[in-house]
Amino acid sequence: MINEYVARKVALKDMQPCAICSKPSTTVLYNASGPDWLYTCEIHLQDNPQFVIPLYSTEYNEAVAQLKLVKGKMDSLTSAQTQLGSWDGWVTKIFSKKEKETNNSKDPDPTTTDSTDTSPQAKNDAEILSETKKQYSKILDKVTELQRKNRKYELAKIMFESRLLRKRTEQVNRERYLKEQENYSNTDPEELLRKHVFPSVPK
């Protein structure tokens, strides 16, 4: 039996106790390779690795990888913006201005020149950061939607092994019952009479 279950919904009239909390549930995990099924509440399928682990699609995994890349880019841009506006950034900027003033003493307005050099870059970085945040939000929405739509799960190792043991026990009991029925049907009626003969009344 393959450890792959699909979450399905059944009608209210078919609901059965949850395998975890015993409350009535309409959600059933079905394994076609068994076949095997067990009822569970929706809440137990969310962030519960001791019970089930979601089996996400390739599209979901690609979206998560893309989300991590965009998050890293966004963090680096945010860090650069923070450093530019921090005390250390301003101190560095002041010292660089003083160096330019001493080196270019003939320049009538060095501050204006410096501001025109740095301001477009800062503006460009802010625009890139804004676009990156929009991209991150869009990918995050996609990941959340794919996570919500996921219906495939695998049981935790201990849980799956207990299901396998239960299936084997049921199979052994079924085979034993069939064998007993076959032996009973193949028995000679006269032999049955001899085995189950009642004691006669003493003479």
UniProtKB/Swiss-Prot annotation:
One of its GO terms (molecular function) is ATPase activator activity. It is found in: Cytoplasm; Endosome. PANTHER family: VPS4-ASSOCIATED PROTEIN 1 (PTHR28218:SF1). GO terms for biological process: protein transport; vacuolar transport. This is VPS4-associated protein 1. InterPro entries: Vfa1. It comes from Saccharomyces cerevisiae (strain ATCC 204508 / S288c). Interacts with VPS4. Residues 99-125, 171-193 are annotated as: Disordered. Keywords: Coiled coil, Cytoplasm, Endosome, Protein transport, Transport. Residues 99-109, 171-182 have a biased composition (Basic and acidic residues). Present with 967 molecules/cell in log phase SD medium. It comes from the Eukaryota. Residues 110-120 have a biased composition (Low complexity). One of its GO terms (cellular component) is cytoplasm.
